[in-house]
From Swiss-Prot:
Name of the protein this chain belongs to: Biotin synthase
Residue sites binding [4Fe-4S] cluster per the record: C59, C63, C66
Lineage: Bacteria, Pseudomonadati, Pseudomonadota, Gammaproteobacteria, Oceanospirillales
Gene Ontology molecular function: 2 iron, 2 sulfur cluster binding; 4 iron, 4 sulfur cluster binding; biotin synthase activity; iron ion binding
Record-listed E.C. numbers: 2.8.1.6
Function comment: Catalyzes the conversion of dethiobiotin (DTB) to biotin by the insertion of a sulfur atom into dethiobiotin via a radical-based mechanism.
UniProtKB keywords: 2Fe-2S, 4Fe-4S, Biotin biosynthesis, Iron, Iron-sulfur, Metal-binding, S-adenosyl-L-methionine, Transferase
Native source species: Marinomonas sp. (strain MWYL1)
Length: 351
């Protein structure tokens, strides 16, 4: 493969071609990935997102990596659906700290009709602050995808997690095809996709190849591709799984960048366990998005000040979006306070 034609998006990557990329000498792979990255993105900019759990715990799914699953005893305290006003206050704080995208996650198999209107209000409020909006709510039906699109949702996160072949070893309560069907509904509704996977769950390299191949065959590619390192949580079935080699994780990011040259590749969960040198290599490999803040749903994340210090050392700047004045932010939150006074926005939403 010529270095001169590797940046054009393709949707027909074979398993053998992707395996060959993984097998390149590390420096050659890094050079190729960085070349693709520079052809498509500002090389020293990273998109910064903040992730908030708007409803925590008691999830009926049995994902073996997840502390929010109701199947495992992780001593995680379940929490009710957050008030819309509180969510918008968190969004405003995230923007103040430099985030350009605000992601909201709910531990559901799928959203109920009781819960859904409140999530729609959260999305509208986040967008009124000048932030990109993203939610992860589980499986969606056609009507729910349409309603999310109508309120202007920018991104829907629904990860494939791993290869189709390894998937049943990790999750049994939702099929791989279920996930693909939700992704199709989201795409058909005009919402951008945030879709990636988790590395270090005991999978083999062929499974990382299979996951990236599946993602790269989506037309168009997911606009955002989170690459997570497993965060081991006591009480989950994967708490004692062997660690993934750090260089293999970096290779996975580099291959993702080559396969999906126009996508934001997010260095996602697991950063708290990485030193600055490892994170720098991930950025060199083509990662150009992170989650910013001390917590990702229920797991730890590097402190915001440490991230900004790392950015300064590397000469990296956060991507910028259109600025909204402080008055506009206050007005958006105040509008939600009025709505809250007119309806009950805080209730049990544990399943």
């Amino acid at each position: 493969m010529s270095i001169n034609n590797i940046s054009a998006p393709r949707f027909d990557w074979t398993h053998a071609e992707i395996k060959a990329l993984f097998d390149l000498p590390f420096m050659d792979l890094m050079f190729r990935a960085q070349t693709v990255h520079r052809e498509n993105f500002a090389p020293n900019e990273v998109q910064v997102s903040t992730l908030l759990s708007i409803k925590t715990g008691a999830c009926p799914e049995d994902c073996k990596y997840c502390p929010q699953s109701g199947h495992y005893n992780t001593e995680l305290e379940k929490e009710k659906l957050m008030e819309v006003q509180k969510v918008l206050e968190e969004a405003a704080l995230a923007k103040e700290k430099g985030a350009s995208r605000f992601c909201m996650g709910a531990a559901w198999k799928h959203p109920s009709e009781k819960d859904f209107p409140y999530v729609l209000e959260m999305i509208k409020g986040v967008k009124s602050l000048g932030l990109e909006s993203c939610v992860t709510l589980g499986s969606l039906n056609d009507d729910q995808a349409k309603r999310l699109s109508e309120v202007g949702l920018d991104y829907y996160n629904h990860n494939l997690d791993t290869s189709a072949e390894f998937y049943d070893s990790i999750i049994t309560t939702r099929t791989y095809q279920d996930r693909l069907d939700t992704l199709s509904r989201v795409r058909d509704s005009g919402i951008k996709l945030c879709c990636g996977g988790i590395m270090g769950m005991g999978e083999e390299q062929k499974d990382r190849v299979g996951l990236l191949r599946q993602l790269s065959q989506m037309t168009p590619h997911p606009e955002s591709v989170p690459i997570n390192m497993l965060v081991k949580v006591e009480g989950t079935p994967l708490e004692n799984v062997d660690d993934l080699d750090t260089f293999e994780f970096i290779r996975t990011i580099a291959v993702a960048r080559i396969l999906m040259p126009k996508s934001h590749v997010r260095l996602s969960a697991g950063r708290q366990g990485m030193n600055e040198q490892t994170q720098a290599l991930c950025f060199m490999a083509g990662a150009n998005s992170i989650f910013y803040g001390e917590k990702l749903l229920t797991t730890g994340n590097p402190e915001a000040d440490k991230d900004m210090a790392l950015f300064a050392n590397l000469g990296i700047n956060p991507e910028k979006r259109e600025e909204h004045s402080d008055a506009a932010v206050a007005e958006a939150i105040a509008a939600q306070v009025v709505k809250q006074e007119e309806s009950k926005l805080f209730y049990e939403a544990s399943v």
